[in-house]
Amino acid sequence: MKDGFLKAAALSPSLRVADCNYNASQIVSQLQDAAARGVRLAVFPEFCLTGYTCGDLFLQRTLQQGALDALQTVLDASRELDVVALVGLPLLVRGKLYNCAAVLCGGRLLGLVPKTYLPNYGEFYEKRQFTPGSTEVENVTVCGQEVPFGTSLLFRCRQMPSFVLGVEICEDLWSALPPSTFHTLAGATVIANLSASDETVGKAEYRRALVSNQSARLLCGYLYASAGHGESTQDMVFAGHDLIAENGALLAETSPFEGGWAETELDCQRMESERARNTSFEPSAEGYLTVDFDLALIETKLSRWVDPTPFIPHDERRRAERCELILKMQADGLAKRLEHAHAKTAVIGISGGLDSCLALLVAVRAMKQLGRPTSDVLAVTMPCFGTTHRTRSNAEILCDELAVSFTEIDIANTVHSHFKDIGQDESVLDVTFENGQARVRTLELMDTANRTGGLVVGTGDLSELALGWATYNGDHMSMYGVNAGVPKTLVRHLVQYEADIAVSAELRRVLLDILDTPVSPELLPAKDGEISQKTEDLVGPYELHDFYLYYVLRFGFGPSKIFRLAKAAFAGRAEYPDEVLYKWLRNFYWRFFAQQFKRSCLPDGPKVGSVTLSPRGDWRMPSDAAAALWLAELEQIPLKG
């Protein structure tokens, strides 16, 4: 449960209709197994103590008492278990029968939540036996314990306050205004649904969509435990279709009729983070009673998949769709700016590297969108001390294949003159040696844009902005930055996508060679004609930095949790032992804080995803903020050896 992780399970034991003792034994057996596996929240189906299909037997006092006796059996068994469990039963309160969920933990009955919406259509006749629950909470005595009864109940873990449980039952979710909506606005981060949803053609897909969409709307975790084998098949069949979703993502599911045990870890902190940044999510806890309970705070072993490349869809079709959409967004943003500025040209510094390649591809799309010739894109290559034949050749071929205007400005003489002006010793390959070239290139581009009535298109990407891997007022500056919202790992896939759809074999070949070229600013002299300065050797692997960037910006997680997630995501990768993950995480935080001043004056550029660093939009951070707290937390992370 540390770091907000909650191991949860939706369970569908095999039952016998109206055999409460047998059902209790099945539930206890599964509950004990779940607890042994580290499950801290176990949700069983609607009426699991009796069976859902008892019909008018629910009105029999013998069955009602049998359900209470079965509840006592489960309560007794739970005394030695560190788990919150929810079971369903009929309950007589003030002469009326209710369809209830009992919430229990450590032998204590925490509360009873009645069903709000009773279906009375098609195959369902619940109003024949039951009364809808009320939002008013009252105390009732059940199994010798005085407990709250009502729909406006929440259950909160003292040791992990981000785990707040709300409960609804089957049809409640299928209604126009589910109780879970109010539960989450009152503070619930996890919703448990005890269900007995019979199986019909197409219903599984609809059920899956309901659960996923509700968890997305409510920014919550959602467990759906449905009745399965053992229910009466007189007129219906039940498939034990169990689902667990989190913020719209389906994390675990059992196939209908394939057994009933869905298990995963929910991230309660993630849900809190989503709500904290969403101003449309307005809390309202009026009329709710919160019951506190205790669970031991231990580290939960992660079994849920942690995506090592959170910006990249893994399904090929979805990835292609995502790439096409992003390219259209980038092109549309640039097209609007070119149109508004009455720009005659789009001027791009082309190096033969990934970022400038993507910017050029976007500019070509923008011109086509505007109905203008691609020759209105002016690509400028500016070779200097570190330029290699490979990148220079690729730049020329790319421009020729895209039919854009091309010019070369050798900046070596200008840089020599500039170094002479400022007294820079050219044998000293320091930051001045590197940044001087970058600033001269920007000067050439800006003045070329002035001369041609054009607009300088920036090439820097989101990952470089996060790390500050750009020369202030050099490649950091442009008139419109089309890649500012695109992380480096995604840049590669966008260029790969353009290669995949390229009609020309030569265009495809050069794009693939650009993809195969090491990422480099080429500011230090080449060695034997090869790139001598490789970015990832200096700042670290971009796939790690993009992973860190995602969790820092998207959810505001701290270093220790991000390190834990990274270990899970990159497990089995020999090149990423814990020491390497730690080294580059520390480097990320140090650079991220130190380089904010560059992000405080960024050119305009389109937002394309949920993570971006525009100082006018998603990221407002003072340039002189201290990183001490984050670095101190890093120091507390234990490393083996």
Q: How would you label these PLM feature ranges?
A:
Residues M1-V347, R365-T374, E401, F406:
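Enzyme catalytic cores with a strong preference for nitrogen-chemistry domains
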Residues N23, P161-F163, C220, S232, ...:
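ATP/NTP-dependent adenylation/nucleotidyl-transfer catalytic domains that generate, transfer
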